[in-house]
């Protein structure tokens, strides 16, 4: 078998502690575990070694740990673990088919087409599938040799035009938006440099078709550079098993071509001439391919240069657009600010106008109130002035009063003080004097005439205190009123003070009231 050359026997002991240690050691060495699994599943036993003197009771054998066949990060039950089984008997059942692979773990997918004699089965890991393929390929089942190979991956896509900075993880992350991805690999050369190609394997066909359609219709970019990936269905090649002799069909063409063994053509022969022409054609194809590759490479470089220049131009255009947008925004903000200032000015002007109007209204209202108060306060003021004039002797409430006296013939305002009541200090007789001017007339209610002498010249007292005569008009120097007074008899001065004005040289300012309506001044 294929894997038997790499087989290495594993010793298993009965001691559980040493058994676990050996199992962990077997888990660290994947080739050893795979070989042990292959031997165990094949039912072959290696030749037992000589028993050790230190451990004579040890028994030799093999142990298999399924987890040791999984690589770090490897997914289970993927499309890469799917096997195609051909040349099956037509009467095989699903239970018989499962029983055939039961030694390689629990399968997850079993499909049988009895009419055409083939089926599919999916195992847990790729390593188990390889072991099962190596062990069961060519096995005779009901007189039919089984043909087992890996099934074609119907959900695999080839990705071209990849950037040198794209990794397996980025490729898987990019295509995970279409559906679950089982594997994504970027192909590299012998130096580990990216070739710009890769493949993506999906868990099912619908996500693969979706990715193929979306990437074909649009431009799917993986990096900043606007370099779209080219997605195509993956071409399936069996580069592991190839075409063995046992699978060759023995046709007439097969036997004709196999008549001559492998050899070199001799120069100058018919074989050599046409072999040379075939080589020239291949060389021309190679040259043309190289020229095409060179042209494509130059075109790619030119496109990259143009793309770089266009990118800078595009960035400048974006910057200009952004600058214009900002300028437009600033202009709009300036307009808004001006409008706001204009509104504020208008509001301020309205407020000022309202304030001015209110002040004018308040002033007008205050003036009206002041005028109303003045109009309301005119009568009390007038009465107070009138009362003051009355108290000063200009006018009484019951008639005009003449401030003149019988003993003071001169009217008010004339030179020289009037004599007091026409008497001197030593004699009660009358003192002759100049005739008195016009005195006050009687009021409508019988105001006394202050111009009548109280004692006549002969010492007799007049019984008639108020002389009979027509009423005179009120007159007063302060009130600007004129009146007439009956002339009185002159009084002669008697006493030490003689030859001058009678009395003490002063007239009675308040007059002499002896009537019933007499009003004292003091």
UniProtKB/Swiss-Prot annotation:
Name the record gives this protein: Paraspeckle component 1
Comp. bias intervals (Gly residues): 497-513
Key word tRNA processing present: no
Modified residues (Phosphoserine): 408, 472, 476, 508
Key words, A-Z: Acetylation, Activator, Biological rhythms, Coiled coil, Cytoplasm, Immunity, Innate immunity, Methylation, Nucleus, Phosphoprotein, Repeat, Repressor, RNA-binding, Transcription, Transcription regulation
Family: Belongs to the PSPC family.
UniProt main location, coarse: nucleus
GO CC term, one of those recorded: nuclear matrix
Location of region: Disordered: 459-522
Modification Omega-N-methylarginine, positions: 506
Stretches for region Sufficient for paraspeckles localization: 124-357
Biased composition (Polar residues): 471-489
Keyword Nucleus: yes
Modified residues (N-acetylmethionine): 1
Subunit organization: Forms heterodimers with NONO; this involves formation of a coiled coil domain by helices from both proteins. Found in a RNP complex with CAT2 transcribed nuclear RNA (CTN-RNA). Interaction with NONO is required for its targeting to paraspeckles and perinucleolar caps. Interacts with SFPQ. Part of the HDP-RNP complex composed of at least HEXIM1, PRKDC, XRCC5, XRCC6, paraspeckle proteins (SFPQ, NONO, PSPC1, RBM14, and MATR3) and NEAT1 RNA. Interacts with ALKBH5 (when acetylated); interaction with acetylated ALKBH5 facilitates recognition of N(6)-methyladenosine (m6A) RNAs.
Organism: Rattus norvegicus (Rat)
Coiled coil ranges: 282-376
Region listing for Sufficient for perinucleolar caps localization and interaction with NONO, in residue ranges: 230-357
InterPro entries the record matches: NOPS, Nucleotide-bd_a/b_plait_sf, PSP1_RRM1, RBD_domain_sf, RRM_dom
Tree of life domain: Eukaryota
């Amino acid at each position: 078998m294929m894997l038997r050359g790499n087989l290495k026997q594993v010793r298993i002991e009965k001691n559980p502690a040493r058994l676990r240690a050996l199992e962990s050691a077997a888990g660290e060495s994947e080739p050893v575990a795979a070989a042990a699994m292959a031997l165990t599943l094949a039912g072959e036993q290696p030749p037992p070694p000589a028993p050790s003197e230190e451990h004579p009771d040890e028994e030799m054998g093999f142990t298999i740990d399924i987890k040791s066949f999984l690589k770090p990060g490897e997914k289970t039950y993927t499309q890469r673990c799917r096997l195609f089984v051909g040349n099956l008997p037509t009467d095989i059942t699903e239970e018989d088919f499962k029983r055939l692979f039961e030694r390689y773990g629990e399968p997850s997918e079993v499909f049988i087409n009895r009419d055409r004699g083939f089926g599919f089965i999916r195992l847990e890991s790729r390593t188990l599938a390889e072991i099962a393929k190596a062990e069961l390929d060519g096995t005779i089942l009901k007189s039919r040799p089984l043909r087992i190979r890996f099934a074609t991956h119907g959900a695999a896509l080839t990705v071209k035009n990849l950037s040198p900075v794209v990794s397996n993880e980025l490729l898987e992350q990019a295509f995970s938006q279409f559906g679950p991805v089982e594997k994504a690999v970027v192909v590299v050369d012998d130096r580990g440099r990216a070739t710009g190609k890769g493949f993506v394997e999906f868990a099912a066909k619908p996500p693969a078709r979706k990715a193929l359609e979306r990437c074909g219709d649009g431009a799917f970019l993986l990096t900043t550079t606007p370099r779209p990936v080219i997605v195509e269905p993956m071409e399936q090649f069996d580069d592991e098993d190839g075409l063995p002799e046992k699978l060759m069909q023995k046709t007439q063409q097969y036997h004709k071509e196999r008549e001559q063994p492998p050899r070199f053509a001799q120069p100058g022969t018919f074989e050599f001439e046409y072999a040379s022409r075939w080589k020239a054609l291949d060389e021309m194809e190679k040259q043309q391919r190289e020229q095409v590759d060179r042209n494509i490479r130059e075109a790619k470089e030119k496109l990259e240069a143009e793309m770089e220049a266009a990118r800078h131009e595009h960035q400048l255009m974006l910057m200009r657009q952004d600058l214009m947008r900002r300028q437009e925004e600033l202009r709009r903000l300036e307009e808004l600010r001006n409008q706001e200032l204009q509104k504020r000015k208008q509001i301020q002007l309205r407020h000022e106008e309202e304030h001015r109007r209110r002040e004018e209204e308040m002033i007008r209202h205050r003036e009206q109130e002041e005028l109303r108060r003045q109009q309301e306060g005119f009568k009390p003021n007038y009465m107070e002035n009138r009362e003051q004039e009355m108290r000063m002797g200009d006018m009484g409430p019951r008639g005009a009063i003449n401030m003149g006296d019988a003993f003071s013939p001169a009217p008010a305002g004339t030179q020289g003080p009037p004599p007091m009541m026409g008497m001197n200090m030593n004699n009660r007789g009358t003192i002759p004097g100049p005739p008195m001017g016009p005195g006050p007339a009687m009021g409508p209610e019988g105001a006394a005439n202050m111009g009548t002498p109280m004692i006549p010249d002969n010492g007799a007292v007049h019984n008639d205190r108020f002389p009979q005569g027509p009423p005179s008009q009120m007159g007063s120097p302060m009130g600007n009123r004129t009146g007439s007074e009956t002339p009185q008899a002159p009084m002669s001065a008697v006493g030490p003070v003689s030859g001058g004005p009678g009395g003490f040289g002063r007239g009675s300012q308040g007059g002499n009231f002896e009537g019933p309506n007499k009003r004292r001044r003091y």
